[in-house]
C-alpha cells in the first residue's frame, strides 16, 4: 500500500556539528585518525628504506629532517596524546571495578593507564638509545 502524503524531511545544514562544543570535540577526536594514517605510512616508508640498505636509510633520515615532516610529526604526537587521553577517560566507563563493596572511581584507573604508558615509553626510549 502506498501513501499520497509527502514525507517530512527535516533539513540539516552541513555544519550542524559546529553548533555544540561536544560535537566539535567529537569531530576533533575522530580527526586524529588522519595523523595516525600519516604516521603509519611514514613507518612503512621507513621499513622499506631500511630494507633497501644504507643509502635508502640515509634518504629516509634526511626526509625526516625536512621541516614540514617535523611539523607533521609533532602534530601527530599531539593528536595521539589527545586520542590517548580520551580513550583513557573512556576505559573506566567500560569496566566496573568493585573494591570492598564499593565501585571504584575513574581517577585511579586513568592514572594507572598513564603510568603504564609513561613507563612503557621510557623503556622503549631507553632500549632505542642504548
From Swiss-Prot:
It is found in: Cell inner membrane. InterPro entries: Fumarate_red_C (IPR003510), SQR/QFR_C/D (IPR034804). Keywords: Cell inner membrane, Cell membrane, Membrane, Transmembrane, Transmembrane helix. GO terms for cellular component: fumarate reductase complex; plasma membrane. SUPFAM superfamilies: Fumarate reductase respiratory complex transmembrane subunits (SSF81343). One of its GO terms (molecular function) is succinate dehydrogenase activity. CDD domains: QFR_TypeD_subunitC (cd00546). The chain crosses the membrane at residues 30-50, 60-80, 110-130. Coiled coil: none annotated. It is a multi-pass membrane protein. Pfam families: Fumarate_red_C (PF02300). Part of an enzyme complex containing four subunits: a flavoprotein (FrdA), an iron-sulfur protein (FrdB), and two hydrophobic anchor proteins (FrdC and FrdD). Two distinct, membrane-bound, FAD-containing enzymes are responsible for the catalysis of fumarate and succinate interconversion; fumarate reductase is used in anaerobic growth, and succinate dehydrogenase is used in aerobic growth. Anchors the catalytic components of the fumarate reductase complex to the cell inner membrane, binds quinones. Belongs to the FrdC family. This is Fumarate reductase subunit C. It comes from Yersinia pestis.
Amino acid at each position: 500500500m502506498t501513501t499520497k502524503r509527502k514525507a517530512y524531511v527535516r533539513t540539516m545544514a552541513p555544519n550542524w556539528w559546529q553548533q555544540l562544543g561536544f560535537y566539535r570535540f567529537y569531530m576533533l577526536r575522530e580527526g586524529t585518525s588522519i595523523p595516525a594514517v600519516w604516521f603509519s605510512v611514514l613507518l612503512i616508508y621507513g621499513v622499506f628504506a631500511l630494507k633497501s640498505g644504507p643509502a635508502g636509510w640515509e634518504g629516509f633520515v634526511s626526509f625526516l629532517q625536512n621541516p614540514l615532516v617535523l611539523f607533521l610529526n609533532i602534530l601527530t604526537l599531539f593528536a595521539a596524546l589527545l586520542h590517548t587521553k580520551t580513550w583513557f577517560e573512556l576505559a573506566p566507563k567500560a569496566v566496573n571495578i568493585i573494591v570492598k563493596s564499593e565501585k571504584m572511581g575513574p581517577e585511579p584507573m586513568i592514572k594507572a593507564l598513564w603510568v603504564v604508558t609513561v613507563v612503557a615509553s621510557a623503556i622503549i626510549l631507553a632500549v632505542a638509545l642504548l
